[in-house]
Amino acid sequence: SEVKMDAEFRHDSGYEVHHQKLVFFAEDVGSNKGAIIGLMVGGVVIATVIVITLVMLK
């Protein structure tokens, strides 16, 4: 469906630019969400390691 839409709207440069902006925006949001999830998972792992270390030391 993506290729079909591009072919249909190829003549409309305004739509083309708008479409590209939306795609870039979506990719940006997606990568940011991935980074946030990565940080959260990393934080949880680090917290777990710290807790285990503290328990081991006791």
Swiss-Prot record:
It comes from the Eukaryota. Cu(2+) binds at residues 11, 15, 18-19. CDD domains: JMTM_APP. The chain crosses the membrane at residues 34-57. It is a single-pass type I membrane protein. It is found in: Cell membrane; Membrane; Perikaryon; Cell projection, Growth cone. Zn(2+) binds at residues 11, 15, 18-19. One of its GO terms (molecular function) is metal ion binding. The keyword Transmembrane helix applies. Keywords: Amyloid, Cell membrane, Cell projection, Coated pit, Copper, Cytoplasm, Cytoplasmic vesicle, Endosome, Membrane, Metal-binding, Nucleus, Secreted, Transmembrane, Transmembrane helix, Zinc. Proteolytically processed under normal cellular conditions. Cleavage either by alpha-secretase, beta-secretase or theta-secretase leads to generation and extracellular release of soluble APP peptides, S-APP-alpha and S-APP-beta, and the retention of corresponding membrane-anchored C-terminal fragments, C80, C83 and C99. Subsequent processing of C80 and C83 by gamma-secretase yields P3 peptides. This is the major secretory pathway and is non-amyloidogenic. Disulfide bonds: none annotated. One of its GO terms (biological process) is central nervous system development. Residues 58 are cytoplasmic. Pfam families: Beta-APP. InterPro entries: Amyloid_glyco, Amyloid_glyco_Abeta, Amyloid_glyco_Abeta_sf. Residues 1-33 are extracellular. GO terms for cellular component: cell surface; clathrin-coated pit; early endosome; extracellular region; Golgi apparatus; Golgi-associated vesicle; growth cone; membrane raft. The record marks 12-13 as: Cleavage. Signal peptide: none annotated. Belongs to the APP family. Functions as a cell surface receptor and performs physiological functions on the surface of neurons relevant to neurite growth, neuronal adhesion and axonogenesis. Interaction between APP molecules on neighboring cells promotes synaptogenesis. Involved in cell mobility and transcription regulation through protein-protein interactions. Can promote transcription activation through binding to APBB1-KAT5 and inhibit Notch signaling through interaction with Numb. Couples to apoptosis-inducing pathways such as those mediated by G(o) and JIP. Inhibits G(o)-alpha ATPase activity. Binds, via its C-terminus, to the PID domain of several cytoplasmic proteins, including APBB family members, the APBA family, MAPK8IP1, SHC1 and NUMB and DAB1. Binding to DAB1 inhibits its serine phosphorylation. Interacts (via NPXY motif) with DAB2 (via PID domain); the interaction is impaired by tyrosine phosphorylation of the NPXY motif. Also interacts with GPCR-like protein BPP, APPBP1, IB1, KNS2 (via its TPR domains), APPBP2 (via BaSS) and DDB1. In vitro, it binds MAPT via the MT-binding domains. Associates with microtubules in the presence of ATP and in a kinesin-dependent manner. This is Amyloid-beta precursor protein. It comes from Oryctolagus cuniculus (Rabbit). The lineage of its organism: Eukaryota, Metazoa, Chordata, Craniata, Vertebrata.
